[in-house]
């Protein structure tokens, strides 16, 4: 970049830019934000705007691109969405009054994790995450700058850190330590995160209170430092730090939440078709965010769950009051984000009107809640602060037709300020005064076409044509001479003009000052507004769950301490909603105290995965306090859910289906307790048949003997059904089918015992494969099944080697040890999956000769 012969203005740009090398610098110049050098070239491509140059005739013209200041936000949004940072440099003085170069300073750095304003507002949270590491444990803090939410926890390993970042759907992660190359690859390439770095811990500890570990303190402190450094102002809306423990909620990895379609449908990445979509009858943006949080973090405290259930039950029992409550909540705006705009000094008159309208609704909401006459609802009533004095201030101060900007005037109501009312009267009546003067002078002078005009240069003046110059009165004084006319003024006109101009200027300045004063007063209420926002959000979510429960005929689940699962006629709530109640086939699920594992067999498309997901969603809904889709439900409280459902390869990281399966299985067996729920669908299918079967059996035995978690294990390995004879806590179930005249009907009902067939060829028929191909598959299947019936299955001990006495009493399949070894080696070398039937028969013949 050539920097010779740089103008003072460009030198100012370069001086500012060197402090923000990792950000696009928007440099305010008049009505535009300009970008220069590499920023201009890159922004022109990304934003699809014109690229020009400064000093075009110079030897080294400077690349330049710009966007209008009034539409800059939409361009900033694009850059942020692409993962970049933007530094905004404003003019800090009036260019007309500046001596030399206009003073400019960066007033804000906008990053993917610190977005407050957006041309496309979204009700979802936007979390900035900070992670620190002390060599043993990780501290993780997160904040939504747009709402003020601020939380911290500590985690044992990087896998947990990754999962929590994914759960928060963060776009930017702030690091206080050096990552390994593998960890950096995971965060940047796999998770598409912007990584930022901060070494300084924020000194003001007013927001950080409570018993925290050192690594939690440093993570939270560095997060605060980064936010203050980028926002460059005191942020009064930031809430006191909340410490949380992962174990205080039902633990689920991001992969588990994705496979269960909790907040978005995994196939479409849209809200539709998710549990969030099903349960969302909220009326406010705050309620939507809280509902998502409840789905993300179901409770493990029975007392807290029952408290939510009780309020939902009260709402269910009072249809009219609940309907009134829902309608009143429709008038509630996003208090959290309005408060943050006040804190950032960005709240406009429309924002305050929305806040005032919300506060006007609060007394009605409070009265409706009181009408339920319920002690559990009264707790919510007691938490509602109506802030009547703030509502009165906004109602009496801000005009209901006020514009969205603070520079256009017409913001403050008439009657709020006497001086402003006087100035407005002068401006309003001044026009009449001028008309009176015009009529009076026209009559006195005899100039019939005499009129008063106005322009910025001459102000108000009498317009006199050349033919009437002889009639001009003596008290007129000349202001300007034109070709065919002259302009005159009078002392009286000048006096009125002075009063009107003063009123216009003073009115605009005074109205701005009054608005700023009102906004400052609103800021003093932010803490109370945030508490009100939390309560209204809770009310909104609870009424939403009541509406959903009534609409879909859900029931109130019960909880037990005896480790039993009883679900009568349960339904997969989301599938039922999509299909319709009439088409959905319910299933009961039962685990007694002695049963820990259900081994489920049956064909694809028959409903095994839906059955497993049904149980998971029922548990999640129950533990978030919701009613559930069933005729009767009695559950233990689970501490975690582990799943492997679905076969999506991790293509970005190069991990195959089988590797992902094994990693998720490892997480489950290492982290699960006897209070956990494990759901494995076709584990082991990603490798060779016997490898997969062996691993599946070993995992089942490990869960049975060492973990004790309630487990549903779906499999195509029918040989595994024999495990029920030696694993006392395992039972076989299968998906029922109906065969008639060669056709197979999947009943989507779970029945006791193992499945007798896989019906894979029937599934292929449904998929539309050619008839000749299906006929050939039937022929091959019959031959393979005939061979299979002539083959003995050898049971392998699962725990420890048998004693020598046991070995002595055990009959040997191959009396001759040498022949045994030869046969074993021959068997190990066989590639069963690639053998023709003829080759299989020949091999079998050769093996028989060795006996």
UniProtKB/Swiss-Prot annotation:
SS bonds (residue pairs): none
GO biological process: mismatch repair
Molecular function in Gene Ontology: ATP binding; ATP-dependent DNA damage sensor activity; damaged DNA binding; mismatched DNA binding
CDD domains reported for this sequence: ABC_MutS1
Gene3D superfamilies associated with the record: 1.10.1420.10, DNA repair protein MutS, domain I (3.40.1170.10), MutS, connector domain (3.30.420.110), P-loop containing nucleotide triphosphate hydrolases (3.40.50.300)
Record carries keyword NAD: no
PROSITE patterns reported for this sequence: DNA_MISMATCH_REPAIR_2
Pfam family, one: MutS_II
Binding-site residues for ATP, renumbered to this chain: 602-609
Keywords attached to this entry: ATP-binding, DNA damage, DNA repair, DNA-binding, Nucleotide-binding
One Gene Ontology term, aspect cellular component: cytosol
InterPro entries xref list: DNA_mismatch_repair_MutS (IPR005748), DNA_mismatch_repair_MutS-lik_N (IPR007695), DNA_mismatch_repair_MutS/MSH (IPR017261), DNA_mismatch_repair_MutS_C (IPR000432), DNA_mismatch_repair_MutS_clamp (IPR007861), DNA_mismatch_repair_MutS_core (IPR007696), DNA_mismatch_repair_MutS_N (IPR016151), DNA_mismatch_repair_MutS_sf (IPR036187)
Alphabetized PANTHER family for the sequence: DNA MISMATCH REPAIR PROTEIN MSH1, MITOCHONDRIAL, DNA MISMATCH REPAIR PROTEIN MUTS FAMILY MEMBER
Function: This protein is involved in the repair of mismatches in DNA. It is possible that it carries out the mismatch recognition step. This protein has a weak ATPase activity.
Family note: Belongs to the DNA mismatch repair MutS family.
Entry protein name: DNA mismatch repair protein MutS
Source organism of this protein record: Streptococcus pyogenes serotype M18 (strain MGAS8232)
């Amino acid at each position: 970049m050539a920097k010779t012969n740089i103008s003072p203005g460009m030198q100012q740009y370069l001086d500012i830019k060197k402090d923000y090398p990792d950000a696009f610098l928007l440099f305010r110049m008049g009505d535009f934000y300009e970008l220069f050098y590499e920023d201009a070239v890159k922004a022109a491509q990304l934003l699809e705007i014109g690229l020009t140059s400064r000093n075009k005739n110079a030897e080294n013209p400077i690349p330049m691109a710009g966007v209008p200041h009034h539409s800059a936000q939409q361009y900033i949004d694009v850059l942020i969405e692409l993962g970049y940072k933007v530094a905004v440099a404003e003019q800090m003085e009036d260019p007309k009054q500046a001596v030399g170069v206009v003073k400019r300073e960066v007033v804000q750095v906008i990053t993917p994790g610190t977005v407050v304003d957006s041309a496309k507002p979204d009700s979802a949270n936007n979390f900035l995450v900070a992670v620190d590491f002390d060599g043993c444990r990780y501290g993780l803090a997160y904040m939504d700058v747009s709402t003020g939410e601020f939380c911290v926890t500590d985690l044992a390993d990087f896998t947990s850190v990754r999962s929590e970042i994914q759960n928060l759907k963060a776009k930017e992660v702030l690091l206080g330590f050096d990552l390994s190359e593998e960890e950096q690859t995971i965060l940047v390439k796999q998770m598409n995160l912007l990584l930022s770095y901060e070494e300084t811990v924020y000194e003001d500890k007013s927001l950080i209170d409570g018993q925290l570990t050192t690594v939690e303190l440093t993570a939270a402190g560095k997060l605060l430092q980064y936010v203050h450094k980028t926002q460059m102002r005191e942020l009064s809306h930031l809430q006191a730090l909340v410490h949380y423990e992962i174990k205080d909620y039902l633990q689920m990895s991001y992969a588990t939440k994705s496979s269960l379609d909790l907040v978005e449908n995994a196939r479409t990445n849209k809200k539709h078709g998710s549990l969030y979509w099903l349960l969302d009858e909220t009326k406010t943006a705050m309620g939507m965010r809280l509902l998502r949080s409840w789905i993300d973090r179901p409770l493990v405290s029975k007392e807290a769950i029952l408290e939510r259930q009780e309020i939902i039950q009260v709402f269910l029992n009072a249809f009219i009051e609940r309907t009134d409550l829902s309608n009143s909540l429709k008038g509630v705006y996003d208090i959290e984000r309005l408060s943050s705009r006040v804190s950032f000094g960005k709240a406009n008159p429309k924002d305050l009107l929305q806040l005032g309208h919300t506060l006007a609704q609060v007394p009605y909401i409070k009265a409706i809640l009181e009408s339920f006459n319920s002690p559990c609802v009264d707790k919510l009533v007691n938490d509602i602060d109506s802030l009547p004095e703030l509502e009165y201030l906004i109602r009496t101060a801000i005009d209901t037709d006020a514009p969205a900007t603070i520079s256009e005037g017409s913001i403050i109501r008439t009657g709020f300020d006497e001086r402003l009312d006087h100035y407005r009267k002068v401006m309003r009546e001044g026009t009449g005064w001028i008309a009176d003067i015009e009529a009076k002078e026209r009559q006195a002078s005899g100039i019939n076409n005499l009129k008063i005009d106005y322009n910025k240069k001459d102000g108000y003046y009498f317009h006199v044509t050349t033919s009437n110059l002889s009639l001009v009165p003596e008290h007129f004084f000349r202001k300007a001479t034109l070709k065919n006319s002259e302009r005159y003024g009078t002392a009286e006109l000048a006096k009125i003009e002075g009063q009107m101009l003063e009123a216009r200027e003073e009115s605009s300045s005074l109205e701005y000052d009054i608005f700023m004063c009102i906004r400052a007063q609103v800021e003093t209420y932010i803490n109370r507004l945030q508490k009100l926002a939390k309560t209204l959000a809770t009310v909104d979510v609870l009424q939403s769950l009541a509406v959903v429960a009534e609409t879909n005929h859900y029931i109130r689940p019960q909880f037990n301490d005896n480790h039993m699962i009883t679900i009568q006629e349960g339904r997969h709530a989301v599938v039922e909603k999509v299909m319709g109640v009439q088409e959905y086939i319910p299933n009961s699920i039962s685990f007694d105290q002695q049963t820990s594992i259900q081994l489920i067999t049956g064909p694809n498309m028959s409903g095994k995965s839906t059955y497993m997901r049904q149980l998971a969603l029922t548990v999640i809904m129950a533990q978030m306090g919701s009613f559930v889709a069933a005729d009767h439900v009695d559950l233990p409280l689970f501490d975690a859910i582990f799943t492997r459902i679905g076969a999506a390869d991790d293509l970005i990281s190069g991990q195959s289906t089988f590797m992902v399966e094994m990693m998720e299985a490892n997480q489950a067996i290492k982290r699960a307790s006897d209070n956990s729920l494990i759901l494995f669908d076709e584990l082991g299918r990603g490798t060779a048949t016997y490898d997969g079967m062996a691993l599946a059996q070993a995992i089942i035995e490990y869960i049975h003997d060492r973990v004790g978690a309630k487990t549903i294990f779906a499999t195509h390995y029918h040989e595994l059904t024999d495990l029920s004879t030696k694993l006392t806590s395992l039972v076989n179930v299968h998906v029922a089918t109906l065969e008639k005249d060669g056709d197979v009907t999947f009943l989507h009902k779970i029945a006791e015992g193992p499945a007798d067939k896989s019906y894979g060829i029937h599934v292929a028929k449904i998929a539309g494969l050619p008839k000749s191909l299906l006929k050939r598959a039937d022929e091959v299947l019959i031959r393979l099944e005939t061979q299979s019936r002539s083959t003995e299955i050898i049971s392998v001990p699962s725990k420890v080697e048998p004693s020598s006495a046991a070995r002595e009493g055990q009959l040997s399949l191959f009396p001759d040890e040498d022949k045994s070894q030869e046969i074993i080696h021959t068997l190990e070398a066989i590639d069963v999956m690639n053998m023709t039937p003829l080759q299989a028969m020949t091999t079998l013949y050769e093996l028989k000769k060795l006996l």
